[in-house]
Amino acid sequence: MAEQVTKSVLFVCLGNICRSPIAEAVFRKLVTDQNVSDNWVIDSSAVSDWNVGRSPDPRAVSCLRHHGINTAHKARQITKEDFATFDYILCMDESNLRDLNRKGNQVKNCRAKIELLGSYDPQKQLIIEDPYYGNDSDFEAVYQQCVRCCRAFLEKVR
């Protein structure tokens, strides 16, 4: 039997309390359900340092629980080491992408492929909008988009 290679993905948004923790939790469930979780290192982080150490937004936690998913994530800011250790850094919008490309260019041994998670959306919704100032239906929309994108991403890279 061929040895499985471990892959790694880091989901990133502005504050790491809404979109990226949802994406991380969705992807964890997908790889667990497909019995490939041992092949993956999965995390999420923020571009900013605003929420370091905080739990995800209660609306994000509620949305995930509604779908039978739990998360114990605590927000953290992306580090230079992340660019050198993760295979994929998947972000939510163009502002994240600009910030990550700028930071990644400052890391000599950047190996991460930095992309928009929405680039994997079969419905072609490139941007995953921040639901922070929205309501429960906005969080549900983020969840559904993350499910579509994470499924397509996993299919492409496995």
Curated annotation (Swiss-Prot):
EC number: 3.1.3.48, 3.1.3.2
Recorded catalytic activity of this chain's protein: O-phospho-L-tyrosyl-[protein] + H2O = L-tyrosyl-[protein] + phosphate; a phosphate monoester + H2O = an alcohol + phosphate
Keyword Kinase annotated: no
Transmembrane segments: none
Location in or out of the cell: Cytoplasm
Regulation: Inhibited by sulfhydryl reagents.
GO molecular function, one term: non-membrane spanning protein tyrosine phosphatase activity
Modification after translation (UniProt): Phosphorylated by LCK. Phosphorylation at Tyr-132 increases its phosphatase activity.
Keyword presence, Methyltransferase: no
Main location: cytoplasm
GO cellular component: cytoplasm
Annotated active site: 13 (nucleophile), 19, 130 (proton donor)
Residue numbers carrying N-acetylalanine: 2
Quaternary structure and partners: Interacts with EPHA2; dephosphorylates EPHA2. Interacts with EPHB1. Interacts with the SH3 domain of SPTAN1.
UniProt function note: Acts on tyrosine phosphorylated proteins, low-MW aryl phosphates and natural and synthetic acyl phosphates with differences in substrate specificity between isoform 1 and isoform 2.
Protein name per its UniProtKB record: Low molecular weight phosphotyrosine protein phosphatase
The species this protein was found in: Sus scrofa
Protein encoded by which gene: ACP1
